[in-house]
Amino acid sequence: MAELDQLPDESSSAKALVSLKEGSLSNTWNEKYSSLQKTPVWKGRNAGPAVEMPFRNSKRSRLFSDEDDRQINTKSPKRNQRVAMIPQKFTATMSTPDKKASQKIGFRLRNLLKLPKAHKWCIYEWFYSNIDKPLFEGDNDFCVCLKESFPNLKTRKLTRVEWGKIRRLMGKPRRCSSAFFEEERSALKQKRQKIRLLQQRKVADVSQFKDLPDEIPLPLVIGTKVTARLRGIHDGLFTGQIDAVDTLNATYRVTFDRTGLGTHTIPDYEVLSNEPHETMPISAFGQKQRPSRFFMTPPRLHYTPPLQSPITDGDPLLGQSPWRSKVSGSDTETLGGFPVEFLIQVTKLSKILMIKKEHIKKLREMNTEAEKLKSYSMPIGIEFQRRYATIVLELEQLNKDLNKVLHKVQQYCYELAPDQGLQPADQPTDMRRRCEEEAQEIVRQANSASGQPCVENENLTDLISRLTAILLQIKCLAEGGDLNSFEFKSLTDSLNDIKNTIDASNISCFQNNVEIHVAHIQSGLSQMGNLHAFAANNTNRD
């Protein structure tokens, strides 16, 4: 019976015959058959011959090990060839996530972001202001140290052992200590201050700014849509618009879009522009800079005020006030240490700006309404066009009145500058005169370079000199740090003088080839944002 138990069953024999007939006997059956033929040898304590025992499949004792009875294979195992795994590209046929599943994930994510700690974590992880972006999104400390320690290392594809060797040579970094955090905060403040100095063009030598990135962000201007960090009761990120810039304290005055938030003063390191912001290479700041000006002042000309001011007559408060006669005639009186006439002009300026702000708000709402009608392919009514044109004309008149008042206010600022211990700045007329003299000298040398004049017509020579003077004025404005409306006015006056001297048939050519390009350059040089209306022609002809 023992021998019968050791034989394979009929089903396995039939399978073996079939496989033999087909010429492919499986290895597994051979291993099974050979294992059935082998019987373990029981080694007893006596020195007698070994007794063969039948093979048992039952559970062995935990003290018994059959490793000694197994045959040791001296051959090394066959190594499979490594197959390079090529990442498969995602195709359009792959299943997209279910809409309900996406909504569920979005709902859970929204609930997560409602938590104060999760919201702050997102702010700390992804919110970087314009002044901090080049500092944090550039090379980290390890990359900087790697460049300094191994300048000849051109590759980044190193093995783990090679990277470990480099880390051992560089030493263990000091992290998460109070001294480390204090040092990092101090270094960050210094870099921010250096960027602010570059933005304000108060630096002539950039050799001390080698630790800054190659691209320096330009300061934000008035009217820029931003996302700002608001602290206090309403702690979080909110969208708004810049209404004022304070370069002295490095802050922005932001009016938030959400009702109830109002206007707040936000530091520049917590304000991020919603649109891609422009940067300037740090090498451009090393060019010749013009000294900063404390006051942006017009030419110091004697101004005779008119007997009746159209703005005062049309003003419901100042026009009907019983103190109008006293206030209008008080040229030498002071109030709070300032001339009364100066305070009147400041009041007018504030009122005009407030009215202009309301008109701009209405115009923005009408633009939104017009875009909505256009998206629905609906016609824009005549009444809508009439209201839109009325607002545009009123804005044009406000800009003219604003330019008049600004002229007077800045004239008083220029007169008050010596009393405050400030040095008056050079006048734009002086800059224009110097540019014209230099242009005439350049044209004269170029015209007589060959020994005889190339252009003999004096009118053409004068025209070339004036056009060259415009280029020199643009160069002076580009090299200057602080731009103001009166410097742009000198450029506009030069264009108007040239336009008045040329023939009427050439005015269209002059506008298309000269004036429009100068206007584009002037718009690019100006950093006054929505206040570019201040750079309009002075309509004060008194």
Swiss-Prot record:
One GO term of the biological process aspect: DNA-templated transcription
Residues the record lists as N-acetylalanine modifications: 2
Superkingdom per UniProt: Eukaryota
Compartment list: Nucleus, Nucleoplasm
CC terms in the record's Gene Ontology section: nucleoplasm; transcription repressor complex
InterPro entries given in the database record: DIRP, LIN-9/ALY1, LIN9_C
Cross-link position per record: Glycyl lysine isopeptide (Lys-Gly) (interchain with G-Cter in SUMO2): 21
Entry's transmembrane regions: none
General function of this protein: Acts as a tumor suppressor. Inhibits DNA synthesis. Its ability to inhibit oncogenic transformation is mediated through its association with RB1. Plays a role in the expression of genes required for the G1/S transition.
Subunit description: Component of the DREAM complex (also named LINC complex) at least composed of E2F4, E2F5, LIN9, LIN37, LIN52, LIN54, MYBL1, MYBL2, RBL1, RBL2, RBBP4, TFDP1 and TFDP2. The complex exists in quiescent cells where it represses cell cycle-dependent genes. It dissociates in S phase when LIN9, LIN37, LIN52 and LIN54 form a subcomplex that binds to MYBL2. Interacts with RB1.
The protein's name in its UniProt record: Protein lin-9 homolog
